[in-house]
């Protein structure tokens, strides 16, 4: 059986539209660059789709495994407690989702964190500001 990857891009959410737009655009960029991957965006609060709704969006796609990645810079309560609770993750950051009547393994990725790519982007924004 061929593996089909799903990616759940998790955003914080906001009452203002820009947070949803940024996370959704990042999810779209991933989907455009990796056309063989099914990408969905979901949000913790104040934005839709919720995480549960985004997970339901994998129905009918044939995904055989899902990676959930928080589009956050650093760990906090949402990353360490709330999201793992919503996704019913074990202590290793793994879980099982039922999609189309099948058990689909889910793995939880780290937040973006300190990375040279982030540093390059920060420097790019500085150059744009000057």
Swiss-Prot record:
Pathway: Cofactor biosynthesis; adenosylcobalamin biosynthesis; cob(II)yrinate a,c-diamide from sirohydrochlorin (anaerobic route): step 1/10. Co(2+) binds at residues 12, 78. Its EC number is 4.99.1.3, 4.99.1.11. GO terms for biological process: anaerobic cobalamin biosynthetic process; methanogenesis. It comes from the Archaea. It catalyses: Co-sirohydrochlorin + 2 H(+) = sirohydrochlorin + Co(2+); Ni-sirohydrochlorin + 2 H(+) = sirohydrochlorin + Ni(2+). Substrate binds at residues 48, 73-78. The active site is at 12 (proton acceptor). It holds the Pfam family CbiX. The keyword Chaperone does not apply. GO terms for molecular function: cobalt ion binding; nickel cation binding; sirohydrochlorin cobaltochelatase activity. The keyword Lyase applies. Homotetramer; dimer of dimers. Belongs to the CbiX family. CbiXS subfamily. Catalyzes the insertion of Co(2+) into sirohydrochlorin as part of the anaerobic pathway to cobalamin biosynthesis (Potential). Involved in the biosynthesis of the unique nickel-containing tetrapyrrole coenzyme F430, the prosthetic group of methyl-coenzyme M reductase (MCR), which plays a key role in methanogenesis and anaerobic methane oxidation. Catalyzes the insertion of Ni(2+) into sirohydrochlorin to yield Ni-sirohydrochlorin. This is Sirohydrochlorin cobaltochelatase. The lineage of its organism: Archaea, Methanobacteriati, Methanobacteriota, Stenosarchaea group, Methanomicrobia.
